């Protein structure tokens, strides 16, 4: 593995130069890969593998929107598209990409489909790490592995199509065959990964759940709402409040961070912006650190897992979720956002 310096800490990373696609194809040439779940991660991973010459079939609940989507993407019922259990029975590698609650619900049936030497693949460590709540405990005579793309399912596919690829982490939980690592890396390359970062199932799920609830989604949404509400309270117009809270971040500043780091973003702004941001950043850091401490403890204790499974397993979960998302969409802030997005310069009629 190649060695990279991450802020003074040396880490090993697998590159597609040392593990090229042709090697992945050779390792997987006799395998049947069943992608179970054609919802979030399933489509991108399945389509990328199919385009890379891997023998892929889909397992999905019939008479569902995801089944119809798989058909639209070229998977043929009875040939490359089957009900979940039927697909699992045919496979040598089972990519278990149902939702976390879905994995728990289907597991009693799925475990009966596993044969000695099969590979059980996850893209999230949730079900394995919190097995005391999910009851997902694989038999000892199968490989249990993980490849977790560092992006949404949509990004897995779009980055593959534009040639950039996606970075992923990988882990081996159980190596019955003695070849689990090679198969895992082959699958990582086959789904479109450019770089593969070693991790463990536990580290992946702990960091992932913290990130989603924190900076990546939950914290971001909460902080945006707080600033927008403050500006509106003090008489700023909706468009001004949104532009100074969301639009300038997403359309300008975060791109500078992505390109060259936080210092580059600061250096690219006015001296007034620099001074204020540098002075206030530690105050925000200190204010939110206790919240992050609480969050991480709830993640590693399994409390967040309990909440997720109870909520997402409820029969009215989908209706409640749609109501929550509708409330966000219909709020003044995000209705303003829709208008602001329509007025971006690239949307002007020529």
Predicted regions mapped to residue ranges:
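NAD(P)-binding Rossmann-fold cofactor-contacting core
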Residues: 44, 50-75
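Glycine-rich adenosine-cofactor-binding loop
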Residues: 31-49
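Active-site-proximal catalytic alpha-helix in oxidoreductases
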Residues: 178-233, 239-257
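NAD(P)-dependent Rossmann-like dehydrogenase/reductase catalytic/cofactor-binding core
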Residues: 2-6, 11-17, 233-350
């Amino acid at each position: 593995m190649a060695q990279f310096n991450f802020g003074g800490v040396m880490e090993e990373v697998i590159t597609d130069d040392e593990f090229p696609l042709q090697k992945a194809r050779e390792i997987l040439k006799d395998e049947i890969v069943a992608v179970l779940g054609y919802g979030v991660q399933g489509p991108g991973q399945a389509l990328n593998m199919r385009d890379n010459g891997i023998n892929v079939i889909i397992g999905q609940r019939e008479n569902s929107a995801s089944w119809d989507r798989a058909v639209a993407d070229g998977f043929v019922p009875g040939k490359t598209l089957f009900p979940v259990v039927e697909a699992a029975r045919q496979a040598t590698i089972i990519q278990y990409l149902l939702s976390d609650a879905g994995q728990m619900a289907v597991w009693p049936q799925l475990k009966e489909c596993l044969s000695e030497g099969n590979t059980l693949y996850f893209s999230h460590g949730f079900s394995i790490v919190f097995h005391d709540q999910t009851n997902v405990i694989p038999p000892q005579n199968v490989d249990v592995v993980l490849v977790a793309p560092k992006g949404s399912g949509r990004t897995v596919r779009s980055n593959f199509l534009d040639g950039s690829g996606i970075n992923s982490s990988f882990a081996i939980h159980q190596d019955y065959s003695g070849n689990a690592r090679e198969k895992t890396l082959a699958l990582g390359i086959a789904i479109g990964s450019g770089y593969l970062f070693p991790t463990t199932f536990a580290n992946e799920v702990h960091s992932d759940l913290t990130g989603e609830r924190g900076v990546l989604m939950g914290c971001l949404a909460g902080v945006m709402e707080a600033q927008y509400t403050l500006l509106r309270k003090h008489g700023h117009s909706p468009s001004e409040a949104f532009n100074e809270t969301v639009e300038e971040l997403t359309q300008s500043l975060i791109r500078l961070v992505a390109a060259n780091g936080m210092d580059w973003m600061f250096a690219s702004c006015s001296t007034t912006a620099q001074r204020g941001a540098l002075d206030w950043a530690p105050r925000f850091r200190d204010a939110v650190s206790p919240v992050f401490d609480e969050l991480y403890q709830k993640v590693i204790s399994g409390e967040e897992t309990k909440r997720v499974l109870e909520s997402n397993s409820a029969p009215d979960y989908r209706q409640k979720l749609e109501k929550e998302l509708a409330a966000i969409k219909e709020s003044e802030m995000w209705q303003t956002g829709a208008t602001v997005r329509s007025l971006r310069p690239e949307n002007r009629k020529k």
